[in-house]
């Protein structure tokens, strides 16, 4: 497919993916071994990429992707695509058939438009991403394409798509790993250091281990699983259908199952996380566990914009935003959402707003994490990974702190010093 300018936009459904999308655009979320954005760019192969997202994310998004954000710098014809679209073979075929001046909707939601340079500039500048507005730019037709609507769908889709890692890297040739199944299904990017004994089970799917990873003894990994660059896995049990981003540390006694762990996150100690999506720069304290099954074996419900939504899933864990910290012994109930920059203690049986110190099960009222503490904690964690905190990082924290103040107030989060009696 030949595309001159590709514009990926996020729509108002970004709120469905909170707390993950407080700090990321919707199309930056993981789906398989890549983000939705990476999948779109790889499939459509455009000459130029433009992104449209919430204004407060602009600088960080430009830095992470290298693409122009919220500017209509269109060159030639433009394909404008909803960032929640998973571009598989069906979607690619439909997009390939799209004619200039046409727009596609699915269930009344704009999926894509193909416009000439002038109209595309106007559509992007004015954020014409609703069907009723798109009609002034293009003829609209309905198609049967699924947009990702809720965060738990990313977990399910990732488990289905991880088979794609069989085409990554090269076959592992060392003898330190006991491979159960075809050796061709254990893939690496090279420079993997293994301290045996390690078992990798690829009978249900491939396993990919990124560059410069360390896999220490008594680790077991089941496929399909993706492990990003520069990770350290120390005696952990990584069950099937897991995604682990770059520079993560997963330690002795850790058990992961069907879970997305984003980059720079630490889970060094004993504890279980299953059927969950965990953001970047999260530190998970020893003994932290996530429930992914109700005692009744009923389906898990998740609070979306103030209403309970039945996920239809019997097994579902939690959704953890970026920069969350859990103390030792934290226990998180199924279906809960943890806002970015929050600190958790004890049992977490309610959703936690951003910038909140939570210890209700210890008899303490939730307290607002001070802005200065959030900034300094980020700086310290970055420093431990050899990463420099930037002005953009600090400005995002400040802006997000302001944007989420009302949410904390409605949830009864108080200002003041946190202390346990």
Q: What are the functions of these language-model segments?
A:
Residues 5-9, 36, 237-246, 283:
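Short low-complexity stretches enriched in small and charged residues
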Residues 1-185, 191, 355-421:
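Terminal amphipathic alpha-helical/low-complexity segments used for targeting or macromolecular assembly
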Residues 11-16, 27-28, 235-236, 249-416:
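Glycine-rich hexapeptide-repeat left-handed beta-helix
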Residues 33-36, 205, 334:
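Residue-level preference for nonpolar/small residues embedded in alpha-helices
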Residues 19-22, 136-140, 213, 264, ...:
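Generic, low-specificity signal for short hydrophobic/alpha-helical stretches with a mild N-terminal bias
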Residues 77, 197, 341:
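Conserved beta-strand and immediately adjacent loop positions that scaffold enzyme active sites
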Residues 19, 25-28, 197, 224, ...:
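Proline-rich low-complexity regions
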Residues 169-279, 294-295, 304, 310, ...:
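Extended beta-solenoid/beta-helix repeat architectures
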């Amino acid at each position: 497919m030949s595309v001159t300018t590709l514009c990926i936009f996020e729509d108002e459904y970004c709120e469905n993916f909170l707390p993950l999308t407080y700090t990321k655009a919707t199309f930056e979320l993981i789906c398989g071994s890549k983000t939705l954005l990476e999948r779109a760019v790889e499939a459509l192969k455009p000459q130029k990429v433009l992104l449209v997202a919430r204004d407060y994310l602009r600088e960080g998004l430009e830095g992470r992707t290298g693409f122009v954000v919220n500017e209509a710098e269109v060159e030639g014809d433009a394909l404008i695509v909803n960032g929640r679209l998973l571009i598989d073979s069906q979607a690619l075929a439909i997009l390939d058939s799209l004619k200039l001046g046409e727009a596609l909707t699915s269930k009344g939601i704009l999926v894509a438009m193909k416009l000439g340079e002038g109209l595309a500039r106007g559509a992007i500048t004015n954020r014409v991403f609703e069907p009723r507005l798109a009609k002034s730019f293009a003829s609209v037709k309905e198609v049967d394409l699924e947009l990702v609507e809720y965060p738990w769908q990313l977990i399910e889709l990732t488990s289905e798509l991880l088979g794609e890692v069989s085409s990554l890297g090269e076959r592992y040739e060392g003898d330190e790993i006991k491979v159960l199944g075809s050796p061709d299904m254990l893939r690496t990017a090279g420079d993997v250091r293994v301290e045996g004994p390690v078992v990798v089970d690829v009978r249900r799917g491939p396993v990919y281990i990124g560059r410069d990873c360390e896999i220490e003894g008594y680790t077991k990994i089941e496929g399909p699983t993706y492990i990003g660059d520069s990770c350290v896995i120390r005696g952990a049990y990584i069950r099937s259908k897991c995604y682990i981003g770059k520079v993560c540390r997963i330690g002795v006694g850790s058990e992961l199952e069907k879970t997305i762990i984003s980059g720079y996150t630490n889970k060094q100690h004993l504890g279980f996380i299953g059927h969950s999506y965990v953001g970047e720069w999260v530190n998970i304290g020893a003994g932290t566990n996530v429930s992914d099954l109700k005692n009744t074996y009923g389906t898990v419900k998740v609070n979306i914009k103030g209403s309970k939504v039945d996920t239809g899933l019997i097994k579902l864990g939690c959704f953890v935003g970026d920069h969350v910290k859990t103390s030792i012994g934290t226990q998180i109930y199924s279906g809960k959402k943890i806002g970015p920059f929050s600190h958790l203690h004890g049992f977490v049986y309610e959703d936690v707003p951003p910038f909140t110190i939570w210890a209700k099960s210890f008899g303490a009222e939730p307290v607002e994490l001070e802005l200065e503490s959030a900034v300094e904690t980020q700086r310290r964690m970055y420093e431990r990974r050899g990463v420099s905190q930037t002005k953009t990082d600090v400005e995002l924290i400040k802006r997000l702190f302001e944007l989420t103040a009302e949410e904390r107030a409605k949830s009864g989060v108080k200002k003041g010093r946190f202390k346990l009696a």
